[in-house]
Amino acid sequence: MASGILVNVKEEVTCPICLELLTQPLSLDCGHSFCQACLTANHKTSMPDGERSCPVCRISYQHKNIRPNRHVANIVEKLREVKLSPEEGQKVDHCARHGEKLLLFCREDRKVICWLCERSQEHRGHHTFLMEEVAQEYQVKLQAALQMLRQKQQEAEQLEADIREEKASWKTQIQYDKTNILADFEQLRHILDWVESNELQNLEKEEKDVLRRLMKSEIEMVQQTQSVRELISDLEHRLQGSVMELLQGVDGVIKRMKNMTLKKPETFPKNKRRVFRAADLQVTLEVLRELRDVRRYWVDVTVAPNNISYAVISEDMRQVSSPEPQIIYEAQGTISQTFVNFNYCTGILGSQSITSGKHYWEVDVSKKSAWILGVCAGFQPDAMYNIEQNENYQPKYGYWVIGLEEGVKCNAFQDGSSHTPSAPFIVPLSVKICPDRVGVFLDYEACTVSFFNITNHGFLIYKFSHCSFSQPVFPYLNPRKCTVPMTLCSPSS
């Protein structure tokens, strides 16, 4: 710090002609001081009758007004007693390339240069001026830049404050959402534990992700603000310092200033986020209430033996499975296995004939890769052996059923189109969780058949409306070609 002050003082008492400390300093009317010997030599080179002017500012002066400057001479004497470090002197006063005094300013390159630099190829043809001649111009420019940077500092600080406020707001909002979610789930915790856990995990993940990104933005805003402050500090130091400090490296400062663009922080609008609300919970509760209501009509369903069906039925008349593949001995002693060719031959009706009222039952289909179940208006023995694959499964033929294929494809079967009336219209069903247990609700008077995914807390899988029940209907089960049994559940299970 002290060395910097001494360098500034030395610059003020340096002769502009010889660039050394003033010796027997003389001052002109304009205020510039020169060594007595330097000023005398300058007079000799001037025209005898020519007008004398200051070598620095070119202002005319009269010889009789030249006066010794004892004050400056005293400063020089004191300064000679102090030895500046050669590094600092080199850094401030001399050209790093040529070691000459830095006296000139190149307008094209915006650099302080020495007289050898001016004559070099690098600056040939450039406009050069004494530093004092351009100091005022850059004083104005840097002052304007300082004002602009101060404004940017205010903007940066405001952005920093905004991001902190948003971070606090997010934390408050997340905590508020947590409280609401916990309060809503308390009503039916024993049923909705999995929903609560899932939603809270998502919310916490969102909190961590958003706060992490906001923290990153905050760090970037702090760094941005610090960069502006550092540049402001640099400019303030230049503006308060000497001409040398003002102009040295000014090109880099101006480039940094021009290239500085305040980066806006990443934000996360709260109105666009998807958060679990009480309304979502209300949907779940409505489903549970609907399931609770239909379960009041749970009837104990069993299957009836049927000579037409090839299905395997358990002794308690609750389990139905497809027969094992038949072993066939062919010619030359070869052995092959085959399933029953008729898809419908494994279908079977429940023992209950339904002609009115509301009825509900559940079927366990866990571990099965294929099945069909629902309601049937009764077999058509004369026609069934002529029907292949799924063609019979249409409401117009008395089937209101859904099914599973390949372990993942859940479908409903509607009437075929006018172009293909014999083939059913297969409706792919979107189920988040493949059902292991299916509830079937038949409302005979309302002409509806509904299917519920008990595995997914009773969410509706599919509903047939406007059913035409012109005759008694029965529960229907078909294990398909999967030997794993499907089981009719008792009301107490």
Swiss-Prot record:
GO BP, sorted A to Z: activation of innate immune response; autophagy; defense response to virus; innate immune response; positive regulation of canonical NF-kappaB signal transduction; positive regulation of MAPK cascade; positive regulation of NF-kappaB transcription factor activity; protein K63-linked ubiquitination
Organism superkingdom: Eukaryota
Residues given in the record as Zn(2+) binding sites: 95, 98, 117, 123
Record's catalysed reaction(s): S-ubiquitinyl-[E2 ubiquitin-conjugating enzyme]-L-cysteine + [acceptor protein]-L-lysine = [E2 ubiquitin-conjugating enzyme]-L-cysteine + N(6)-ubiquitinyl-[acceptor protein]-L-lysine
PTM text: Degraded in a proteasome-independent fashion in the absence of viral infection but in a proteasome-dependent fashion following exposure to restriction sensitive virus. Autoubiquitinated in a RING finger- and UBE2D2-dependent manner. Monoubiquitinated by TRIM21. Deubiquitinated by Yersinia YopJ. Ubiquitination may not lead to proteasomal degradation.
Subcellular location, principal: cytoplasm
Pathway info: Protein modification; protein ubiquitination
Record key words, sorted: Acetylation, Antiviral defense, Autophagy, Coiled coil, Cytoplasm, Immunity, Innate immunity, Metal-binding, Nucleus, Phosphoprotein, Transferase, Ubl conjugation, Ubl conjugation pathway, Zinc, Zinc-finger
PROSITE patterns per UniProt: B302_SPRY, ZF_BBOX, ZF_RING_1, ZF_RING_2
Positions of region (Required for interaction with GABARAP and for autophagy): 185-198
Pfam family name, one: zf-RING_UBOX
GO molecular function, a single term: ubiquitin-protein transferase activity
Modified residues (Phosphoserine): 85
Family recorded in the similarity comment: Belongs to the TRIM/RBCC family.
Protein name, entry field: Tripartite motif-containing protein 5
Higher taxonomy: Eukaryota, Metazoa, Chordata, Craniata, Vertebrata
Gene assigned in the entry: TRIM5
